[in-house]
Amino acid sequence: MDIKKLPKEIIEGRRLKREEDLRFFATANLEELCQGADNIRKVLCGDAVNLCSIINGKSGKCSENCKFCAQSSHHHTGIEEYSFLDTNLIVEDCKKHANKGVHRYSIVTAGRELKGKDLQVACDAYKRMKEECDIDLCASHGLLSEEAFIALKESGVSMYHENIETSKRNFPNICTTHTYKDKINAIKLAQRLGFKVCSGGIIGMGETFEDRLDMAVSLAELKIQSIPINTLMPIKGTTYEDLEPLTEDEILRTVAMFRFINPTANIRLAAGRSLMEDSGRRAFHAGANATITGDLLTTSGNNIDKDKEMLTQMGFHL
């Protein structure tokens, strides 16, 4: 494919499909690739940037064995473990982020599935945030039942987050306590019940570039419109503690590729921005138009005010 002509074709309506040979993304000139992705973003998405923030609502002791995760009970990382946070604390944190201009706020909890008392506590918190905070609500609570999804919906949650993490082929290499199909089923159930879905994955876990391509295409097939791209920051005590972090060029190539394959989605920089110069500034000229701002789950994130200042200087509208 001609990387110089492809952006115009995508802007005019072409969509890249699984059956096409997309391996050229791995070797295309990086500057041309990023410029093309930026042009697609400008025309199809405009200059609006979407900011979201999260709070780690319930930390550690997770039954699942995801090799990248500091919260898995299969790892010994020394992270702080605690049961569900107090509702007042969550609501006050949400207000703080809303007042800073963040667009969406999510409680994220460790564990395969939120249920029982913890689900009720979460729903109570979402109801209060819906009433007291001027912000859209997202939730990230694992592989939920239909009843749990409905409870969240009735509590004011409009978006659900469930990463597919990697390609279908590679998924068994990173987790064996649940399956790729479990993830897809949860996403489709959330969509059927009327949720917008935020879903992406993690790069830098030893996967091939073809795995990243497959993940990008799978998300396009699922019609996902918010795609977080996390770059692995190896955490001591996890299976992946000794993996070499990706270079900035590798991250930029992946971000740009995701924009070509998901041209109208919010491509959201998530964990790993610190691996890039100036908090990933170049990635916002390579197709990204959204980010998680503030602290993350078990790693420090980016300062909200500094993010807003940088993005405004770059010509984005908040």
Curated annotation (Swiss-Prot):
- Cofactor(s) in the UniProt record: [4Fe-4S] cluster; [2Fe-2S] cluster
Task: Give the reactions, separated by semicolons, that this protein catalyses.
Answer: (4R,5S)-dethiobiotin + (sulfur carrier)-SH + 2 reduced [2Fe-2S]-[ferredoxin] + 2 S-adenosyl-L-methionine = (sulfur carrier)-H + biotin + 2 5'-deoxyadenosine + 2 L-methionine + 2 oxidized [2Fe-2S]-[ferredoxin]
InterPro entries cross-referenced by the UniProt entry = Aldolase_TIM, BATS_dom, Biotin_synth/BioAB, Biotin_synthase, Elp3/MiaA/NifB-like_rSAM, rSAM
- HAMAP family assigned: BioB (MF_01694)
UniProt keyword S-adenosyl-L-methionine present: yes
Tell me what this protein is called. Biotin synthase
Q: Transmembrane region positions?
A: none
Say which species the protein is native to: Alkaliphilus metalliredigens (strain QYMF)
Q: What is its EC number?
A: 2.8.1.6
| Binding positions ([2Fe-2S] cluster) | 106, 138, 198, 268
What molecular function terms (GO) are annotated for this protein?
2 iron, 2 sulfur cluster binding; 4 iron, 4 sulfur cluster binding; biotin synthase activity; iron ion binding
Give the UniProt record's GO annotations in the biological process aspect.
biotin biosynthetic process
Any idea what job this protein has? Catalyzes the conversion of dethiobiotin (DTB) to biotin by the insertion of a sulfur atom into dethiobiotin via a radical-based mechanism.
**Keyword tags:** 2Fe-2S, 4Fe-4S, Biotin biosynthesis, Iron, Iron-sulfur, Metal-binding, S-adenosyl-L-methionine, Transferase
- Tell me, how does this one assemble? Homodimer.
| Gene3D superfamilies, per database record | Aldolase class I
